[in-house]
């Protein structure tokens, strides 16, 4: 599996680290326009100082960059620069850079090594770990891709200081998810210190990032290709979230914002189906109540949505099987499972309506 390094600064000693992992000192370094401006000089200078041969690539900082057209352009630049299978690709950025970089690495010369250097909380704790890499199709998100594990995941929590608050909260959705699905003690820590993590205070931030990354790594190690349902538990709340993202045209909602809404729906569904008790439901909701959204985002893209249309949009999600939706539910805080039985539409719709009412009450406080 991947080696995960969490430290500040993470760019020190890369030559030795690459040597230990049998990686060449020939790297294609992929940025988006934002991460190039924020971190490009530091990363490139650190690599050059240690004798790396580099090819630099930059993509627009937007979800639309996860496309065949952008990938083809980058393939061309790599071919023109004589990049062969002895090279590796270092992806410096958030989920878009990591997904596109991993997709290109998985497919170029039938696969070259990829190193992920995530710079957003969402990427550090989720998308950069586990080897799922993909691009989008007009009919759905992340539908075309590979399993291609990174050799290294290089995480520097200090880079999060560059993020706007909206991106921090978007990433926190995945962090909180790990407490829900896999680690009750981690949930307790987040319950006690959510404000410190949200404001990037140490040691709580690094603890949250490292614990999240290691939980994801552990789950992926035990069920790499989602064969026994364990890895599917990472998708707690995501079936709802992907439906919300589709309704918002994959543009108006951050993934983590949709996940936060989806977590509330999934908590209610777990309770309605008789698995999660009322006290645990309330604890979960109290934690999620602390999330902050931009003005009107919840109203416009969740409360004003048609619940039946949301349910219909959920059927484009990758977690459907044999045209049936599969839901990850909680037995208790810290223990999730993949519910293999069909869930009546009426139960799903009732969970959505309960979640909407919950958000309405939060907005009034």
Swiss-Prot record:
Cellular component per GO, a single term: cytoplasm
Compartments it resides in: Cytoplasm
Catalytic function, reaction form: 7-phospho-2-dehydro-3-deoxy-D-arabino-heptonate = 3-dehydroquinate + phosphate
CDD domains registered for this protein in UniProt: DHQS
Superkingdom of this protein's organism: Bacteria
Family matches, as Pfam families: DHQ_synthase, DHQS_C
Co-factor note (free text): Binds 1 divalent metal cation per subunit. Can use either Co(2+) or Zn(2+).
PANTHER family in alphabetical order: 3-DEHYDROQUINATE SYNTHASE, 3-DEHYDROQUINATE SYNTHASE, CHLOROPLASTIC
Name of the molecule in the record: 3-dehydroquinate synthase
Organism this protein belongs to: Chlorobium chlorochromatii (strain CaD3)
